[in-house]
């Protein structure tokens, strides 16, 4: 059996005809191909960085497939030096029903773990521009994935982390927790570029964020990522983090806008909220019935209450609450705000409790990571700042 890159457009579409059964959601196969090729395939994050791979048996039959996505990242070494490199995220791991139960997925992942597909296409200049770190070391290449099958991938060397998250229910009423204003960005003075009248009795204004607002904030955060990343402690020999630049947001928001008509909801115009120096950006996941927080940057823990209330208000007033009934915040956002922004865990927990959030295990999309170089795979490494934003 051999692992090979799938380069033929026709074979890539044929591969999608199988994965569509798992991830097609509301889409026909034609719409699914359009989303992958045109809507997402041409986003800067995917263009020339997304590759398809197939496992082939001796007669040439493709029995399993997956995708890899190359993105710039930082790695801090045991000597304290920070270097930039490429990560190769693995997604869309799929075995057609007729080939299941024969160990093909295991064979494919063993071959993926051997490093066959992980040849960098990003130039050093691309990586330096994205990371701000001029010391590029591609021997430190990393391959993350987000497991939907528990600890399955750990036997091939991937190191799993937490699947803890916080869930905030949305009851569909016109106003949530005292939030006022109309966030939809089309009518009234409280649109995307306007402000609400404050939430929960606070006088501070909450601003709803347009797509461009989110990109502007992402640019600011990406420029400080190296210094923020350095603050994050690690117990092992290495730590790794994918750069949270605007290209990652572009991919998520393009999905949400494209899928809206198929989910029979308005195309979203609001993608986050901000109060003072605190902000969050979100992604509408209609098939999961979730508004997932891509990023939460908190100057004060109590601002989380305002931002969650604003998110609930957006869902209720902008016509999404019939399709989306919960807000999801991954545990990694709590960790990042505690370490990088110096907020106490207790204060964040109190804000989550005040927002009626509950902590639970996701059971899916479990972040895991491994070095590409075999000689490094036995070294302990921590995957930091790997919330929903960098999921793929």
UniProtKB/Swiss-Prot annotation:
Pfam families xrefs: GNAT_LYC1-like (PF22998)
Keywords per UniProt: Acyltransferase, Transferase
Organism: Yarrowia lipolytica (strain CLIB 122 / E 150) (Yeast)
GO biological process terms, semicolon-separated: L-lysine catabolic process to glutarate, by acetylation
Protein name as annotated: Lysine acetyltransferase
Activity regulation, per record: Activity is inhibited by 5-aminovalerate.
EC code: 2.3.1.306
GO MF term list: L-lysine N-acetyltransferase activity, acting on acetyl phosphate as donor; L-lysine N6-acetyltransferase
Catalytic activity from the UniProt record: L-lysine + acetyl-CoA = N(6)-acetyl-L-lysine + CoA + H(+)
Presence of the UniProt keyword Transferase in the record: yes
PANTHER family recorded: LYSINE ACETYLTRANSFERASE, N-ACETYLTRANSFERASE DOMAIN-CONTAINING PROTEIN
Function: Lysine N-6-acetyl transferase (LAT) that catalyzes the first step of the lysine degradation pathway.
Keyword Transferase: yes
InterPro entries in the cross-refs: Acyl_CoA_acyltransferase, GNAT_LYC1-like, LAT
Pathway linked to the protein: Amino-acid degradation; L-lysine degradation via acetylation pathway; glutarate from L-lysine: step 1/6
